[in-house]
Every structure is written in C-alpha cells, then in structure tokens.
C-alpha cells in the first residue's frame, strides 16, 4: 500500500449520511454539515441546489423541481446526485477557482458491498479525487472520539443516524461484532408524522415532525412528566392551516417501538460479544453517536433498559468525519481495515 505515504495536506475525511454530509479537512478542520438533499429540474435534469438550501425548498417548489435525498439507509441510491452533492460541498470548502485533486477517506458501514463501493468510487472520481480510501464507520468513530488507545479493552459504539443504526464492538484487532438496522432518526420522524395525522387529522412536514421528536422524545420514560409542544400543519378535514398542541405521550407512542427495536439489537450484540470484552464494556459504558443519540435522556434511557452505562460522545454527529480525517495517523493499527479504491 505505497499510496499511504502520499497522504498529506489535502486529505479530506468524508461522512456521507442519509441526513447530512460532514467533511474534515486538514487545512481547515471540521466543515459543519450540509443536508444530504439536492434539488433538480425534472425535465432538464439540471441540478439547482444542494444541502440546506435544497432542503429549505422542500414543499415550496413547482412540480417540475424535484427535491430528493441521494442516500437512503446509509447507501447511495442516486449516483449522479451523490456526486453532485459531494463535488459541490468539497469545492465550496476550497477557494473559488483553486485547482486541486484531493485524497478522500470515506466512512462506510461495516460490510459494504461491491455495488456500493463502486458508487462511492464514481462519486469520488466526479470530485477529481486522485485517491479514495474507505474506512469502516466504527473505526472512524473510535478515532474521532480519541479512544483508539483504549480499544484493546473493548469498546461498544451505538450510532443512531438519520438513515440507519449501526452497533459495533471493537477491540485492538478491529471490529469484533456488528449489527446494521434501518431503525433511525428518519423512521422516528415518519412515525411522528403518521401519529399526528392519525390522531389529530393534521398533515405536518418532516421538519415539524423532527422538531416534535427533539422537543418531546426519549425522556418520557425517565421523568413521567407529561410535556406539550405546539406545531403547525394543514387540516385534512378543511385543508386550512392549523396549530395544535402535541403531548409527550403522543411522541412516546410513535417512537417507542423504534427505540425498543434498537434496544433489542443492542442486547443481541452484547450477547454475541466475547466474554473477555464484556467486563470492559460494562465498566467503560456504551458510547453513543449520531444525530438521534442527542434526544433528551437517550443515554439514561439506554442505561436503564440495557443495564450498562451509556454516554453521548462530544459532537456525536461529527466524530465519523473527524476520525476519517485523522485515520492515517493510526495506519499501522488499522492498515487491514482501510480499503484502497483507486
């Protein structure tokens, strides 16, 4: 792997998620997330906007403009859209007109298949990358949290992202046990949206559903104190704009089944973990990352249900990108886990 020595000032760590894309660049550090959303003209195929700007256009555009997410459940479903998104964000982060060929280190779920690898390579080529390397997300997370020196003791990471949940146990030898599921922040948003529609006969958008999830989700099982948040939508009956008050019990009913599926997956992974690592995990706790890990009281809820201490990492939405950007510092430890695409 002679290419390793060539990495340097133009290394870019990339975490492309279903909800957001985050970059970590050697020359400027963390590049805060842009939404993984694109706007395209249905007739001409021309891309009109990306990121937060495209997301803000959702529900406000004429029928010929399509707003979409090129990633679904942590996999590329729109190659061209992903290439446009990645290319736009990388180039925006450099000086206008600057000619460069970056080297990309991209986070991927454990067990990515050949089709998905090819899709990532095509997206990287569109950016002009002269080298592309894949790193498993759990390993990137360990590096992003600064835990690489403690891996030999056993580390459990629960990554509850926008499109999937990844649960991993790592040791000095790499990933020991892992599990991928489609329960995610996005499925919670859909459940909230459907609950409001069925219970109140109101249609709300995904942004409103996410706001309700953040305001009222997770901590219901800890304090048992009912809470209320207001939201706006369109009445299914009259078609007019209305404002309603939604309760924490409503949100609990919506997202509980999803949370408890995640908890079941955590238990299953613990049951498959070698006994030599379990004591360390129980002592050091479960590390939580991903956007949905930030729901109020989620760490305490997991601690209570699973019986193992859990805590949310600093900047949990960004640790994968930071870890990818610094991966080459630990090349001797993780050489076998880095996949050279070209």
Residue ranges, per PLM feature:
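Nucleotide/phosphate-binding catalytic cleft detector across ATP-hydrolyzing
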Residues: 1-160, 168-286, 293-342
């Amino acid at each position: 792997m002679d290419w390793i020595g060539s990495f340097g000032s133009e290394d870019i760590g990339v975490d492309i998620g279903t909800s957001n894309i985050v970059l970590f660049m050697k020359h400027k550090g963390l590049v805060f997330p842009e939404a993984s959303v694109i706007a395209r003209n249905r007739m001409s195929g021309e891309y009109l906007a990306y990121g937060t700007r495209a997301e803000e256009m959702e529900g406000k555009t004429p029928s010929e403009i399509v707003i979409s997410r090129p990633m679904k459940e942590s996999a590329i479903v729109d190659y061209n859209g992903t290439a446009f998104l990645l290319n736009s964000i990388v180039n925006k982060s450099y000086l206008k007109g600057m000619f460069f060929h970056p080297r990309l280190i991209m986070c991927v779920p454990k067990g990515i298949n050949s089709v998905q690898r090819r899709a990532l390579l095509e997206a990287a080529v569109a950016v002009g990358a002269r080298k592309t390397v894949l790193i498993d997300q759990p390993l990137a997370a360990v590096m992003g949290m600064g835990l690489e020196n403690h891996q030999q003791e056993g580390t459990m990471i629960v990554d509850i992202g926008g499109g999937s949940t990844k649960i991993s146990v790592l040791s000095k030898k790499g990933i020991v046990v892992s599990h991928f599921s489609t329960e995610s922040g996005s499925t919670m948003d859909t459940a909230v949206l459907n609950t409001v529609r069925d219970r109140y006969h109101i249609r709300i958008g995904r942004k409103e559903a996410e706001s309700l999830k953040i305001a009222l989700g997770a901590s219901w099982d800890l304090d048992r104190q009912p809470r209320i948040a207001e939201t706006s939508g369109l009445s299914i009956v009259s078609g007019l704009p209305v404002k309603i008050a939604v309760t924490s019990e409503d949100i609990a009913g919506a997202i509980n089944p999803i949370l408890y599926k995640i908890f079941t997956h955590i238990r299953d992974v613990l049951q498959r973990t070698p006994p030599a690592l379990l004591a360390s995990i129980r002592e050091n706790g479960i590390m939580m990352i991903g956007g949905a890990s930030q729901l109020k009281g989620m760490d305490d809820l997991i601690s209570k249900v699973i019986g193992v201490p859990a805590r949310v990492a600093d900047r949990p939405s960004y640790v994968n990108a930071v870890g990818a950007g610094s991966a080459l510092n630990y090349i001797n430890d993780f050489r076998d886990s880095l996949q050279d695409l070209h």
